[in-house]
């Protein structure tokens, strides 16, 4: 899922991706029955995910790109809603900016997400190229080093891994942190 509101829950009229085919090249049409279909879908998905991540990481004043990968959700709708809820949580976005591994804010965002799942089975990891910390096991604190967590959260690209523990569905969403500069940029903006 990618939409421009993953930066601040407001949709911009300027962010659009349009894919068109005129047929003028004379290539055979790609349909679900065509052997090229799976390769086309995989390539298009990779491009769309890359553009979505680039867009989210380029939010006003952003210093971190946040990716949330949800696994073992009961269904795709819930997996998508949970991943989006985490990256859109202003409290969690501010925690990332402050390099605070505040797993309670992640759990809060998951908890207010509509869906039929057991919050008691949720496990959460925070990772980046600096390492990984396991911060929440079965909706409770999992011991971790604050110093290690701060190192993980000092990197630009932050991955939040959420294991719902209830099914086979998965989804991914992207967002960015919430910074002082975001407020300044948008507070100073005049139309």
Residue ranges and their predicted role:
Residues 81, 88-191:
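Internal helix-turn-beta structural module
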Residues 1-3:
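Short, small-residue-biased leader/transition segments that mark boundaries at the very start
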Residues 20-21, 70-72, 126, 162-164:
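Flexible glycine-/small-residue-rich
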Residues 12-15, 61-65, 119:
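Short gly/pro-enriched beta-turn/loop segments at secondary-structure junctions
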Residues 22-98:
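A glycine- and small/hydrophobic-rich beta-loop-beta segment
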Residues 6:
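Active-site-adjacent loop/helix surface patches within enzyme catalytic domains
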Residues 14-22:
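Active-site-proximal loop/short-helix segments
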């Amino acid at each position: 899922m990618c939409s421009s509101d993953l930066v601040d829950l407001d949709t911009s009229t300027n962010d659009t991706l349009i894919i068109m085919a005129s047929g003028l090249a004379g290539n055979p049409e790609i349909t679900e029955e065509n052997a090229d279909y799976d390769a086309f879908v995989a390539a298009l998905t990779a491009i769309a995910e890359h553009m979505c991540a680039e867009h989210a990481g380029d939010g006003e004043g952003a210093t971190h790109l946040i990716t949330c990968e949800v696994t073992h959700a009961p269904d795709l709708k819930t997996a998508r809603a949970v991943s989006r809820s985490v990256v859109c949580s202003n409290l969690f976005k501010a925690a990332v900016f402050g390099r605070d591994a505040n797993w309670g804010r992640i759990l809060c965002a998951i908890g207010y997400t509509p869906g039929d799942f057991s919050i008691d089975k949720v496990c959460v990891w925070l990772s980046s190229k600096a390492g990984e910390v396991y911060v929440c096991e079965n909706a409770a604190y999992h011991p971790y080093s604050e110093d290690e967590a701060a190192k993980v959260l000092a990197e630009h690209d932050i991955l939040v891994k959420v294991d719902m523990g209830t099914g086979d569905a998965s989804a991914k969403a992207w967002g960015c942190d919430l910074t002082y500069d975001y407020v300044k940029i948008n507070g100073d903006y005049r139309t």
